[in-house]
A protein has these predicted regions:
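Hydrophobic, Leu/Ile/Phe/Ala-enriched alpha-helical segments that form helix-helix packing faces
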Residues: 215, 562, 645-649, 721, ...
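Long, largely alpha-helical accessory region at the distal end of helicase-like NTP-driven motors
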Residues: 482, 689-776
């Protein structure tokens, strides 16, 4: 029986294989090839035959892979191609691996066509662990990690016990001591021991919390984690549960109106874009739609751009729905496999039971069944886009593709919608619904733009803080309110420079300056933010021996300055350095939400869709670093970030204050912050600029990146490739601005950072008309 198989490789074709079948007597004298249907009932004749979606073990180029059967009746094709004698047999079925659904394969093909990659690359992204043996080994490694943590916990507990005994002994000696000097010495030693005990107790508490997070909901941990088709779904251990039944969701009049409009858009078979100002109650509308979908026995996929947002939403959603599945990269491999198993074994709509799956973009690749609703929250967020490796897909666009396959409804939501989504609304592809009022009828936050150049001239700056901002923060703290500060640069200082020769230390492997980082104990080091290499920092120039001076300020320095200005405030920092520990990130957000932190300083990760009830002041320091990026979307994304950040404050009926410190107070982006991002205002200007120069949404853009360790070779290759593309696409050279009637090729050119990890980088940008077919593009 000839079949075609999708392999997790970058192949433009799907290799042919054959399966040998022993026919039963009821098959008669049938001989030769006969096709295997992808649908239909199992008979005595074909019960051993593979079907579309089955996982099979095959040999390709001397290596064994697990592939997915994409065609099970390929005998005719193999004969036409004249390869019957060259086809290899399959090695067998991939035991313990569930079949792939036909909807999954269809989605993979759409993604491969749209994002110019192969189906095999999409399969590899959807199922990264391809071998049963590998999965079992990974589970065993996780089990060994748990065992090590258990041993460490036992050691620490024993040490605490010994220290407590020593502390008790010191207390007894102090009580018996006749001389005051001896008594004081014993008491001092007791305090030292108690301090050490306190540190160990905190460490032990942290370890226990991490252990519970890792293993608390996994049953049979360390056993084989592969699942057979006849297994019962194991949903209980990985479903977030809350006591009681589903809560009734009550909407305000404005929300009810928006909800009704969304239902009308769904009835027309279109995606809906919910453009609601921050704090307008978009989440309640999502949950109401989800509740209605679950009542029909269908599943809901709720996508968020970041893991941190997923964690904050878990409690909120589980309050409404007793059952919730969570899927993102922060979950263990075992938990992720269990989520997939639950969805595979989900009942039919008639059974009246559905699931809500909360996850990041990777949740799109789950084996969904009976999908009724897809929610894409913060649809503008760049985190939905995967840059590398292939498939370089956009989670928002892919979710819409998937919804079409399942016939599911789609709702996109944001306070700052993307230009592409607004454009799709203007041409009738999407339906637009707006929420202009905040849920608690709070007025929009006041905006104050502070000119840092003018402030410095009149001695109005203390470090990175203007005196005006210091006054606002002091007033806020005096009223027991919270402050959120955004600085879009981590580290202590972005660069250091020699005061004698002007040398700026750069990474040896990247064409980028090194950033100065300070550790908790006070030591300093230089770090490359692109390749991660770390260099010793001596404070002396390696060229002339002159003194190196830190220039600029990152979040570490801002935290240091804030601690000096407000010594009694509880201050924390949240950036990609501190958030390397998921526990620290979660704890920091929780503490700030609970009012245990007064001032939170961070990068753009603090500007996401968090809901902090006690926050009344948000400030952006050195805001100009957000703008001026090497991208035609720089102003759009800068405005979105600032609007999102502004929306963090004043969310509980109290008016907030948004402060921007900038050296360019007249910049159009700052003057456009008004909470009214729509197709008729600022976004209309952005769309006009895009149309003038032929950029999306009026065209499709393909970015071609060429990398090589040899600079001369990458220059030659990129130049030749650029000329080849111009010839292949029949590009007409024109110096006049405006939308060209045909394709256009820009470059090759060097990006701002043209060398990373010793690889020289060149780029080519290809602009294609939107009416050009995807197959022709590929």
């Amino acid at each position: 029986i000839f079949i075609q198989v999708i392999l997790p490789l970058r192949l433009e074709w799907e290799p042919f294989y054959y399966q040998e079948i022993e026919l039963s007597e009821s098959a008669g004298d049938a001989s030769g090839l006969f096709p295997v249907t992808s649908t239909g009932s199992v008979t005595e004749r074909d019960k051993e035959q593979v079907r579309v979606g089955d996982r099979v073990r095959v040999n390709f180029a001397g290596k064994e892979y697990v592939g997915v059967v994409s065609m099970a009746d390929a005998g005719k094709q193999a004969e036409e191609m004249g390869i019957v004698d060259k086809v290899k047999p399959i090695l067998g079925m991939a035991e313990g691996l569930e079949p792939v659904t036909k909807e999954e394969i269809e989605l993979w093909r759409h993604i491969a066509e749209y994002y110019l990659c192969t189906v095999g690359e999409v399969y590899k992204a959807a199922y990264p662990a391809q071998k049963v043996e590998k999965e079992v080994v990974q589970a065993r490694q996780e089990a060994l990690k748990v065992e090590r943590e258990e041993k460490n916990r036992t050691k620490i507990a024993d040490k605490i016990k010994r220290l407590e005994e020593r502390a008790e002994k010191k207390a007894e000696l102090a009580a018996k001591a006749r001389k005051s000097e001896s008594r004081e010495r014993y008491l001092a030693e007791k305090e030292m021991l108690e301090g050490e005990i306190g540190l160990l107790v905190r460490e032990l508490t942290s370890m226990v919390g991490e252990l519970c997070r890792t293993t608390g909901s996994v049953t049979g941990y360390g056993d084989s984690v592969t699942y057979h088709q006849d297994e019962e779904p194991i949903g209980g251990s990985i479903i977030e549960t809350s006591e009681g039944t589903e809560k009734e969701i009550s909407l305000s009049a404005a929300q009810e109106e928006a909800y009704s409009k969304i239902k009308e858009i769904f009835a027309k078979g279109k995606p809906a874009l919910l453009h609601g100002v921050t704090g307008s109650g978009k989440t309640e509308i999502y949950l109401k739609l989800a509740q209605e979908t679950l009542a029909m026995g269908k599943n809901v996929l709720y996508l968020v751009p970041e893991i941190a947002l997923s964690r904050q939403l878990e409690d909120r959603i589980s309050e409404t729905f007793p059952e919730l599945l969570v899927f993102h990269s922060g979950e263990t491999m075992s938990r992720k496999r269990e989520v997939a198993t639950v969805l595979r074994h989900a009942g039919e709509p008639a059974e009246g039971k559905g699931y809500v799956v909360l996850g990041t973009r990777s949740a799109i690749f789950l084996p969904h069944k009976n999908l009724g609703l897809v929610i894409v929250d913060e649809e503008h967020d760049t985190s939905y886009k995967q840059d590398s490796p292939a498939p370089r897909y956009n989670g928002r666009e892919t979710a819409i593709m998937m919804a079409k396959i399942f016939g599911a409804n789609v709702i996109l939501g944001s306070a700052t919608p993307s230009l592409e989504s607004l454009y799709n609304c203007s041409v009738g592809r999407y339906g637009l619904v707006t929420l202009n009022k905040r849920f608690y009828d709070a007025a929009d936050s006041d905006i104050e733009i502070i000119d840092t150049i003018a402030e410095r001239r009149k001695n109005g700056m203390i470090g990175n803080f203007s005196r005006k901002l210091i006054e606002h923060i002091g007033k806020c703290l005096g009223e027991h309110r919270q402050v959120l500060i955004l600085r879009e640069r981590r580290a202590y200082s972005p660069i250091v420079q020699c005061q004698e020769c002007g040398e700026i230390p750069k990474c040896r492997c990247c064409n980028v300056s090194l950033s100065l980082h300070r550790r908790a104990e006070g030591s300093e080091r230089l770090v490359c933010h692109y390749c991660g290499r770390v260099y010793e920092y001596t404070g002396k120039c390696h060229k002339c021996g002159g003194e190196l001076k830190p220039l600029g300020s990152g979040t570490q320095k801002i935290e240091e300055e804030a601690s000096k200005l407000f010594p009694n405030a509880r201050i924390a920092r949240l950036d990609s350095d501190t958030a390397q520990s998921r526990k620290y990130e979660t704890d920091t957000i929780r503490k700030f939400s609970n009012g245990e932190i007064d001032i939170l300083i961070g990068t753009r990760m603090v500007a996401k869709g968090f809901d902090f009830s006690g926050l009344s002041l948000v400030a952006v320091l050195q805001a100009d670093s957000i703008l001026g990026q090497e991208d035609y979307r720089a102003d759009e994304r800068g405005l979105q970030l600032l609007e999102q950040f502004r929306g963090r404050c004043g969310r509980r009926g109290e008016k907030g204050l948004f402060v921007i410190q900038t050296s360019q107070p007249e910049h159009p982006v700052y003057q456009s912050i008004d909470g009214k991002l729509d197709e008729n205002g600022t976004m209309a200007r952005f769309l006009g600029e895009r149309k003038l120069f032929g950029y999306p949404p009026y065209s499709r853009v393909i970015g071609v990146v060429i990398k090589d360790y040899n600079q001369a070779r990458v220059d030659l290759l990129s130049r030749d490739l650029g000329e080849y593309l111009r010839g292949a696409l029949a590009v007409k050279v024109s110096l006049a601005p405006g939308v060209q009637n045909g394709p256009n090729v820009i470059g090759p050119y060097s990006p701002a950072i043209d060398k990373i990890s010793n690889q020289n980088i060149r780029q080519i940008r290809v602009l294609l008309p939107k009416d050009r077919s995807l197959a022709r593009n590929k």
